[in-house]
Design a protein with these regions (language model features):
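Acidic, low-complexity, intrinsically disordered interaction modules
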Residues: 16-77
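N-terminal trafficking/processing presequences and adjacent post-cleavage segments
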Residues: 1-19
């Protein structure tokens, strides 16, 4: 599986899966993935998380690109 950049935003204010992802309880999966900043092309290792939104489990990779600026990646098939 590949991880593709989805969005970024300031701490506490980022929409993912149509909701403010910071309003949900992130559960770690214990996995980490290597991703690349889409603007500066720096490599990062982000943790993979899961959240339950409207009864459905969603997975994403997230971490800070810089202080309080978060990047989010989604797993893509093929």
């Amino acid at each position: 599986m590949a991880w593709e950049y989805e969005t970024f935003g300031p701490d506490g204010q980022c929409k993912l899966f149509g909701v403010n992802i910071f309003n949900y309880d992130w559960q770690t999966t214990g996995k980490r993935v290597k991703v690349q900043d889409p603007i500066y092309h720096q490599d990062h290792t982000f943790e993979v998380w899961q959240v339950e939104i409207d009864g459905k489990m969603r997975r994403f990779a997230a971490g800070e690109f810089s202080n309080c600026v978060w990047g989010f990646y989604l797993e893509k098939n093929g």
